[in-house]
Regions:
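A short, Trp-centered hydrophobic/proline-enriched beta-strand micro-motif
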Residues: 34-45
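Positively charged n-region of N-terminal signal peptides that target proteins for export
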Residues: 1-5
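Bacterial signal peptide processing site
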Residues: 21-23
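A short, structured loop/turn motif at beta-sheet edges
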Residues: 32, 59-66, 114-117
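Mature, soluble, non-transmembrane domains
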Residues: 44, 75, 80-145
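Short, surface-exposed binding/anchoring microloops in extracellular/periplasmic proteins
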Residues: 45-62, 67-70
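Bacterial N-terminal signal peptides
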Residues: 7-15
């Protein structure tokens, strides 16, 4: 209980989330400046949501998804019936998704970025006063085309 109170107090410190958002904004600007016109990457989203845990290979051309292939669904336990109807993001859209997850005042996130391209490679977060709100995003095998 004591640790929970300290965590909530830490999250209530003004500037905690804005610092994360400023860092993310700097990486997003660097990504947008360096972003190739076409690229491929694999990613996985985990959350308390349908199709959580699936690995996708995403092809992007001119900042639009042109192909999304499900490459591994062995860890998926819910949402298999409509997994292929889910929209998949570009790397630019992952920044927007992470920022949206930081909107609640009690939200936190940790984001690691690719050192060359500056897109998120590993992000996780939670909203501490909501049940089942923990999420992760993992990006791997990025390749410029």
């Amino acid at each position: 209980m004591r640790q929970s109170i300290h965590l909530l107090l830490f999250l209530a410190i003004p500037g905690f989330v804005p610092a994360c958002q400023r860092d993310m904004a700097a990486h997003r600007r660097a990504w947008e400046a360096a972003r190739p016109s076409s690229y491929v990457f694999e990613y996985q989203r985990t959350c308390f949501c349908p199709a959580s845990g699936a690995w996708w290979r995403i092809t992007v051309k001119r900042d639009s998804v042109t192909d999304a292939q499900l490459i591994d669904s062995t860890g998926v336990t819910r949402g298999l019936r409509y997994i292929h109807s889910l929209a998949q993001p570009t790397l630019s859209e992952l920044f927007t998704e992470i920022a949206a997850n930081l909107e609640p005042a009690t939200a936190w996130a940790r984001v690691d970025y690719d050192p060359q391209w500056h897109f998120p490679i590993n992000a996780s977060g939670d909203v501490v006063d909501r049940t089942d709100s923990k999420w992760t995003l993992i990006v791997r095998h990025f390749r410029s085309m």
